[in-house]
Amino acid sequence: MPKIKTSRVKYPGGWELIEPTIRELDAKMREAENDTHDGKRKCEALWPIFRISHQRSRYIYDLYYRRKEISKELYEFCLDQGYADRNLIAKWKKPGYERLCCLRCIQTRDHNFATTCVCRVPKHLREEKVIECVHCGCRGCASGD
């Protein structure tokens, strides 16, 4: 007799520790997606979504790599279910990308002259005015800041 597949996801042990924070960030994400973008530039409408996505990924990264409070099974579950960005976390593990805000800032095809975003320039090399990234609104994510 074939097994019956259910749509219910089985959560690994330790999920109850991170669930309230994940649910809170999901609610913020829904609110940011439904928020009106009247008076904002086209690119500015997506900035809150990028910030919340970064915050959620950083939360899971810190729990697993820095504080070591969650198991590998729970960490992999969060990545597989889309609670954290696997590619962004992979970049955070490399030297020089520890504070990276989003993957679009390091993709050379999205920028003039095949370079990275202005937010990747260290603060001591910039001019005095504050510059925000066009993609995600970051003001600086270079590791030397």
Swiss-Prot record:
Principal location class: nucleus
InterPro entries associated with the record: BUD31 (IPR001748), BUD31/G10-rel_CS (IPR018230)
Domain of life: Eukaryota
Coiled coil: none
UniProt-annotated location(s): Nucleus
Single GO biological process annotation from the record: mRNA splicing, via spliceosome
GO CC terms, sorted: spliceosomal complex
UniProt keyword terms in alphabetical order: Nucleus
Entry-linked PANTHER family: PROTEIN BUD31 HOMOLOG 1, PROTEIN BUD31-RELATED
Name recorded for this polypeptide: Protein BUD31 homolog 1
Species per Swiss-Prot/TrEMBL record: Oryza sativa subsp. japonica (Rice)
